[in-house]
Amino acid sequence: MKFCTTILFLLCALSAFAQTTVYQAFEADSAAEPRGGMPYVTTFLQANLRKPIAAEAQGVGGRVVVMGIVEPDGRITDVKVVNKFRPDCDREAVRIFSLFKAWKPGYKDGKPIRQYVNIPVTFKPSPPFLYENGARVSYFDKDDKLIADSSKAQYKQLVPVDSLGIPSGDIIVYKTKGKVWKEETRMPLIRKESSARGPSGKTEYLIGYQDGIIQWNGLLVRVDDKGAILRQTYFQDGKRSGTELVYHPNGSVSEKTEEFDDKYVTTSWYPNGQIRQIQSSAKQKPNVPTPPDHVLAYWQDTGRQMVRDGAGRAVYQSQVPLPTDTTKYIAFVEEGMYENGFKEGIWKGRYADGSYSYEEQYDKGVCQMGKARQADGTELRYTEVEKQAEFKGGMPALGQFLASNLRYPADAQRARAQGKVFITFVINTDGSIADAKVLKGVGYGADEEALRVVKAMVGRWNPGLLRGKPIRVKYNLPINFTLQ
C-alpha cells in the first residue's frame, strides 16, 4: 500500500511539473501566436498606449521589450520587462501588454503548453513642452502666437493635467505686467453628470472645458462613478476633431475612431484584445445624403475572420437597453451578409428572449424595406432604419415659425443685450415637447422668451423613429436675438 502511495505521489508531482514547465518558442511543436495575427497586436498596443506625461513633455522616444507567459487557455501572465527604457514607460508597457489576452497557445506532443513570448512596445518621439507643478505651460506673444522664449511673451497659459494627460483643473491665462504675471482669463474645468447611462446603469460624468457658448473645446473625457475612463474625444469649436477612444470596463480600448479628410475609420476590439472590426464612415455634408458605413473586415471572438476585403457573413452580439426599462440591458444579436463592404440581402436581428425581432432587405448598404415585430406581437414596416425628429415642413418652416413668433423683450432692447439662447428639450413619441430648459442664456427676459416660443411648438414636430417605432429624442436649439 505504501508502495502504491509513493507511485501516486510521483505521478502527481510529474503532472504538476509538466503543467508548470514554461517552454521557449523553439521548443514547441507549434509556437503560441496572437489571434488575428501579429500586426493587429501592434495596432492594439498602440491604441491603448498612454505615454506618461513626463516622457511626453520631454519629447523622448524609445522601445521597451516585455516578456510574458501564454497559458494553455490563451491568457497572458507573469508580464515583465526584458529591455528597459525608463521606469514610467516600462510600467506602461507592462500594463498594455497585460491587457492582450487573445492568444493561441503553443502545442507540444499534441497538448497546449505554457510558453514565453516577447514583444516590443514603441514610444514615439513627440514635440517637447514645458510641464511644471502638474500643468502644461505655454507662452504667447502679443498676437497670440505660440513662442518658446518666455522673456518675449505677453501671455502665459497654464493647463493642469494629470500623469495621463487628463484635464485636472481650470485653464488660466496670465498677462505680463512688467515682471509680474497677472491673471487675465480663466476657463473652468467642467464636471457634470452625463444624460447617458452605460450597461452598469450607474451615473457617468463628463470632464472638459466649455467656451462662452457652451461648446466643448479640447479634450472631453467621460468617466464612471469611480473615475475610470469610458471615452475620450477631442473637440474644436463644439465639433469632434481628431481621434476618439472608447474603453471596455476592464480598461482596454474597445473602439478607436480616426478622422481623415472625408471619412472616419473605426477599429474595434473585444475585451480580451482580439480585433473585432474595421469600418469607415463618411463625414456628413450639408444637404447631401450620407452614404452607408463601409465594413472592410470582421472577426469572431475566436479569432476567425468572417469578413475579408468587405465580403462575408457577420454575426454581431451586443447589450442594448430594454425599451420598458432603460436601466436594464438585454443581449441583441444581428446577422447578415456584406458585399463590397456594404450590407446586402436579408439582415435579421433579435433579442435573446425573443421579445423583439426585425428583418430588413438591403441593396448596396441601403435599407429597401424592413419589418419589426414588437413584444406585443404587432408588426411595424418601414424603409428607413432611423429617422430623426423634425419640425413639420423642415428647417425653412422652423425658421419661419421663429421669425413670426419670437418677440425681442423690451428689457433686452434697453440693455442692448443680444446673442444666442441655447434651449434643450425632448420631443416625445407623440411629437409633444417636454423638459424644455435654458442651457445658456443672455438674460433680460430673452431666456424666458426663447422658452415660451419653444413650448409653443407643441404639435409641430414629427417624432424620431427607430425601425418604424416612435422614440423620444433630445434636441438642442439655438435661438438668436440680434439688434437691428
Predicted features and spans:
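Extracytoplasmic
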Residues: G61-V65, I76, R114-N118, Q418-F422, ...
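Glycine/tyrosine- and acidic-biased, solvent-exposed loop/turn segments at the edges of beta-strands
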Residues: Q19-Y23, P39-T42, A47-R50, P87-D88, ...
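Short, solvent-exposed beta-strand/turn "edge" segments of beta-rich domains on protein surfaces
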Residues: A55-G59, R414-A415
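Positively charged n-region of N-terminal signal peptides that target proteins for export
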Residues: M1-C4
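Mid-chain, structured segments of secreted extracytoplasmic proteins
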Residues: M67-R95
